[in-house]
Swiss-Prot record:
Originating organism: Neisseria meningitidis serogroup A / serotype 4A (strain DSM 15465 / Z2491)
GO cellular component: cytosol
Protein name as it appears in the record: Glycerol-3-phosphate dehydrogenase [NAD(P)+]
Pfam families: NAD_Gly3P_dh_C (PF07479), NAD_Gly3P_dh_N (PF01210)
Function: Catalyzes the reduction of the glycolytic intermediate dihydroxyacetone phosphate (DHAP) to sn-glycerol 3-phosphate (G3P), the key precursor for phospholipid synthesis.
Entry keyword set: Cytoplasm, Lipid biosynthesis, Lipid metabolism, NAD, NADP, Nucleotide-binding, Oxidoreductase, Phospholipid biosynthesis, Phospholipid metabolism
Catalytic activity from the UniProt record: sn-glycerol 3-phosphate + NAD(+) = dihydroxyacetone phosphate + NADH + H(+); sn-glycerol 3-phosphate + NADP(+) = dihydroxyacetone phosphate + NADPH + H(+)
Binding-site positions, NADPH: S10, W11, R31, K105, A138, R253, V277, E279
EC number: 1.1.1.94
An example Gene Ontology biological process: phospholipid biosynthetic process
PANTHER family, per database record: GLYCEROL-3-PHOSPHATE DEHYDROGENASE, GLYCEROL-3-PHOSPHATE DEHYDROGENASE [NAD(+)] 2, CHLOROPLASTIC
Name of the gene this protein is made from: gpsA
MF terms (GO), sorted A to Z: glycerol-3-phosphate dehydrogenase [NAD(P)+] activity; NAD binding
PROSITE patterns named among the record's database cross-references: NAD_G3PDH (PS00957)
Superkingdom of origin: Bacteria
């Protein structure tokens, strides 16, 4: 199958590498013309995922039309902020009918829409829209270390058709029609990872980390259920699986944001040092707004938002959470 990958960050590049190494032709495209030239010349993404050479089956395209030609699937792996404009480009290039998966995680700022909802809004006639989510770090996938993820769409027939096509010896895919649950799990776990990074940075220990992960899962489940998701989805790869990885893994950008804030650094400084997008930061406010809309209590999210707004110190965030009224779990 020919697969088009839009977005050449670390995750987009890792997916392009992976699928091109497992029987697919892949075209990789990004808006950044300088990055395209660099990748074409070096046959490697030295900016986004250095150290991994591109196979012959991976083509880096300067022209999106070339990248979309004969494509059977489009993966949009931009930041959530770039998702809508990428979907609009598909329409512009006459490719709005192609099957498309959002492989980014978060809520769109200002609209509060989940990734698949953005795609449905831009491409209302497309019946093959979904998300790819789950516990997966780009570096590990590029090294061909095993992982398992979830492909979710409201179109069950398409999921049943696509999952076997994309399954490999390295990446095992599970299908789901609970696209809301899969998308919410992927989005909100980034917020919880900042909280656990904060706790770890303050050296509050493993007990505190376990408490934050567990109560974070409770927050995610409450919100997802209110939005129409199946609670059991949060017990799977797209829920607790992704949450554990992002909250504990050394490669987690969002956890590193929390670690940096615990050191007393300004948020902008932390983001510059990380050098990549942290979807958790841009998601916090939209998650809180959505929780308010559905009247869902999300204390971890709320206190983190106050931290980002400089209304609290890192220490006060943890103190506030510990001082909450006693209740049954």
């Amino acid at each position: 199958m020919k697969i088009t990958v839009i977005g050449a960050g670390s995750w987009g590049t890792a997916l392009a590498l992976h699928f091109s190494q497992h029987g697919n032709r892949v075209s990789l495209w990004t808006r950044n013309a300088d990055q395209v030239r660099q990748m074409q010349e070096a046959r490697e993404n030295k900016r986004g995922l250095p150290g991994f050479s591109f196979p012959e089956t991976l083509e880096v395209c300067a022209d999106l039309a070339d990248a979309l030609k004969d494509s059977g699937l489009v993966l949009i792996v931009t930041s959530v902020a770039g998702l809508r404009s990428s979907a609009e480009l598909l329409k512009q290039y006459g490719a709005g009918h192609l099957p498309v998966l959002a492989a980014c995680k978060g809520f769109e700022q200002d609209t509060g829409l989940l990734t698949f909802q953005v795609l449905k809004e831009v491409l209302p006639d497309n019946k093959k829209i979904g998300v790819l989510s789950g516990p997966s770090f780009a570096q590990e996938l590029a090294k061909q270390l095993p992982c398992a993820v979830v492909l979710a769409s409201e179109n069950q027939e398409w999921v049943e058709e696509l999952v076997p096509q994309l399954n490999t010896s390295v990446m095992r895919l599970y299908g789901s029609t609970d696209v809301i649950g899969v998308a919410v799990g992927g989005a909100v776990k980034n917020v919880m990872a900042i909280a656990t990074g904060l706790s770890d940075g303050l050296e509050y220990g493993l007990n505190a980390r376990a408490a934050l992960v567990t109560r974070g899962l409770a927050e995610i489940t409450r919100l997802a259920s209110a939005m129409g998701a199946q609670p059991k989805t949060m017990m799977g790869l797209a829920g607790i699986g992704d949450l554990i990885l992002t909250c504990t893994g050394a490669l987690s950008r969002n956890r590193r944001v929390g670690l940096g804030l615990a050191e007393g650094k300004e948020l902008h400084q932390v983001l510059v040092e990380i050098g990549h997008v942290s979807e958790g930061v841009s998601t916090i406010e939209e998650v809180f707004n959505t929780a308010c809309k559905y009247q869902i209590d999300m204390p971890i999210t709320q206190t983190l938002l106050q931290l980002i707004r400089k209304e609290m110190t890192p220490q006060q965030v943890v103190e506030r959470l510990m001082e909450r009224s006693a209740r049954f779990e």
